[in-house]
Amino acid sequence: MNPSIIYASNSGFGPEGEWSRNGSMDAVCQAMSGAAVAQGGGPSHEPVLIENCPADQSGAWNFAFSIVSALFHRERTGRGQWLQTSQL
């Protein structure tokens, strides 16, 4: 295999663990992270989803930043990397 290849994968819950085979989307991440409860005013209130899909966006930003960082690393060292990121 070419040692300078950058292989990147992104999933909802990571490549291993009990949730690894499940898909994910913004509402799931907000619910599981507690963001929907916090936005709704706390545990004694109804959860409220944050508009504009922040978990979808931040997951994509983290994935893109990981790739850019790997490109910088390859520019300096000539070596690629295997990246695994998750939405949550």
For the regions a language model picked out, list residue spans one by one.
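Active-site-adjacent "lid/gating" segments in soluble enzymes
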Residues: 1-88
